[in-house]
């Protein structure tokens, strides 16, 4: 049986696992009820669907570990950020944004999403943007855009309770993740700085059972440091010339042993490529043919 915790108007259903393919699900209740990211665990969500009157379903972004049990709540007003909405309307769009479109991984990835995760395209999508408010009757949410992990990643603030939902800006030691084609390291950095300015007594992440209370500044610092630490590892690896695929094979970011047949190899490659772009722009590395190398001064 999964663990739950009530904080003010928010009930947290902690994910069956603290990582993919599950996430924390939130139920926010005023006179109306909002369900957030139904992906904690199937039995709990089937029970929730049978026992609760859900008025709104909100997905923080389009990743499978946040949408896997959406079909249990078909017919409910569906909300997501405008910038991620195309991925809910079209599986092909999602494949393109993830980066599998036109690759050997595409069909297997699509099969996994539709069969294992039950993905269905949604034609009726109510789009929110940064600052959009939702009045549940006695409880008001302010949606907050945290782009980077995906273009439309969105959490929210409940001002009267000083509760901040971080979504997948989850501040874990393993993050952040920018493994999709449409992800952006710089946008993640900017989102961290945005979060730093938000006044909240309680901050809830999408993964793990730790609820953050009070100042999360030091956690934000460590989260950013992970990005810069990865960059240093890449620079160290480029003491001798290496191609993008050779760097991806080292698993410098994920730490997983990956074969090129695994889609996670593509995701590792995507993340490494984003760092290489940053390092090239910063003139810390050079490129000759397909090989990259650290500049002599670095």
Language-model regions, residue ranges each:
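Short glycine/proline-enriched coil/turn segments at helix->beta-strand junctions
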Residues: 30-32, 50-54, 71-77, 159-162, ...
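Active-site neighborhood of phospho(di)ester-bond hydrolases with catalytic His/Asp-centered motifs
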Residues: 35-39, 54-65, 78-81, 143-148, ...
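Metallo-beta-lactamase
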Residues: 140-231
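C-terminal regulatory/interaction regions
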Residues: 233-298
């Amino acid at each position: 049986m999964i663990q739950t915790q009530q904080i003010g108007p928010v009930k947290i259903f902690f994910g069956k696992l603290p990582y993919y393919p599950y996430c924390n699900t939130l139920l926010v209740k005023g006179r109306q009820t909002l369900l957030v990211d139904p992906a904690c665990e199937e039995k709990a969500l089937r029970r929730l669907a049978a026992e609760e009157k859900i008025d709104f379903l909100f997905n923080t972004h389009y990743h499978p570990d946040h949408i896997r049990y959406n079909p249990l709540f078909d017919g409910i007003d569906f909300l997501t950020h405008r910038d991620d909405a195309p991925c809910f309307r079209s599986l092909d769009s999602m494949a393109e944004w993830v980066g599998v479109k036109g690759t050997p991984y595409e069909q297997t990835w699509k099969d996994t999403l539709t069969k294992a995760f039950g993905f269905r395209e949604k034609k009726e999508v109510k789009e929110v943007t940064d600052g959009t408010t939702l009045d549940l009757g006695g409880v008001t949410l302010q949606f907050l855009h945290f782009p980077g992990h995906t273009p439309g990643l969105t959490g929210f603030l409940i001002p009267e309770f000083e509760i901040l939902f971080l979504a997948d800006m989850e501040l874990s030691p393993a993050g952040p993740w920018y493994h999709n084609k449409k992800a952006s390291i710089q946008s993640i950095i900017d989102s961290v700085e945005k979060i730093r300015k938000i006044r909240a007594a309680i901050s809830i992440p999408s993964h793990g059972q730790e609820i953050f209370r009070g100042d999360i500044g030091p956690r934000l610092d460590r989260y950013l440091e992970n990005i810069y630490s990865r960059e240093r590892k890449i620079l160290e690896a480029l003491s001798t010339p290496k191609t993008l695929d050779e760097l991806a094979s080292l698993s410098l970011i994920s730490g997983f042993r990956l074969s090129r047949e695994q889609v996670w190899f593509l995701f590792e490659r995507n993340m490494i490529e984003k760092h290489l772009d940053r390092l090239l722009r910063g003139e810390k590395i050079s490129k000759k043919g397909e090989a990259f190398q650290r500049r002599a001064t670095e």
